[in-house]
Amino acid sequence: MTSIAAEEKVNIHTALAARGRSLEIPESADAYGWLNGSWELDVRKYWGVDVAARHIRGEAHFGWTLEGRALQDVWIMPRRSERTADIDKTMNMYGTTLRVWDPSIQAWRITWTNPAGNHREEQIGRWSGKDVVQLGARSDGTPTRWSFTEITPDSFHWLGEALQPDGKTWKLEGEFLAKRVS
């Protein structure tokens, strides 16, 4: 077994990052590559609470990882420059999403985790018309639907919904307006 020579030390960021989408993922299936880059978030609603008047700002950064077979992100709220030691736990988000293309189902398998808020979800994502829709469930089994809507090269509207106990009504719990920074 050969080892990585001392002069070839690689940090996790270098080993994780990829230059672009893997050729194994058809261009027509690339529902997330347009997100690559950094975004400023205007938080409108979080955990069902209307927070628009609080002017909470966040940030999100997206990039290809795992030899281009996945798109990973980090969502941060409040943004790093505004974080303090006494952050309100109900408004604290510092989590990551891993979206991996699965050719067997012709969709993306998605795992989200926010350790700051003890929140985890598994979803399946794909194009639905002009939107990207992710369906899945929280760790407690609550069905969820997350959507990227109003997509342009420089902006998107993100909606997070949870199915109510009646099994018919979707409640809007999260809403972010995003503008591209880079």
Feature roles, as predicted:
Residues M1-S182:
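Hydrophobic small-molecule pocket/channel-lining residues, especially in calycin-type beta-barrels
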